Amino acid sequence: MDVKIEQSWKQRLIPEFEKDYFNQLISFVKEEYRQGTVYPPGPCIFSAFEHCPFDKVKVVNLGQDPYHEPGQAHGLCFSVQDGIPFPPSLVNIFKEIESDLGKPVPQTGNLLRWADQGVLLLNATLTVRAHQAGSHQNKGWETFTDAVIHHLAEERSHIVYILWGAYAQRKGAFINTSRNLVLKSAHPSPLSAYRGFFGNKHFSKANDYLIATGQTPIEW
């Protein structure tokens, strides 16, 4: 199957694209787009990869599911398109950046500026039916995104993995902590942000590690 995805990722993921689960997944996703509203827009499904080639990845931030309301999701976890109000988790992310780094809350919740610096903003599930959180879970996306993380874990080192919440921490449990920095805390959701997300200083810790390993820090 010819999948439109950034070339450096494509060459590594071709074996995945040939597997039965992936063909079943794509058939399911195509039918979902045909029958109703699905987010993100089709051309944005693999945006995280387009903006962050394999060899440029410095930070991996694992999310779970795309936003499921109009205009929000555009292929990067936690990010929303320009002009869209910030969802609660993103509000809390910006609050932590302000507390950690002293940076004011930005005008836009579009995190493409992070992706273009080497932050892979990867949801475990890359599509969702409108207004139905989790509606495309357990259809195959998780297997695909596991393969993505395995390629990074096997071929690259000195990457910062940011794992917020139990789901992301389970998904990243196999990552080698001696060759990478793995940062874990509660999720920025209002349900859990006060149980360990606020004050985690993950943004400064990530940059300190990047500098220590000879890399350029991220302008969060």
Locations of regions flagged by a protein language model:
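Generic N-terminal amphipathic, Lys/Arg-enriched alpha-helix
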Residues: 1-13
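A polyanion-binding, active-site-adjacent surface
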Residues: 3, 15-163, 167-170, 175, ...
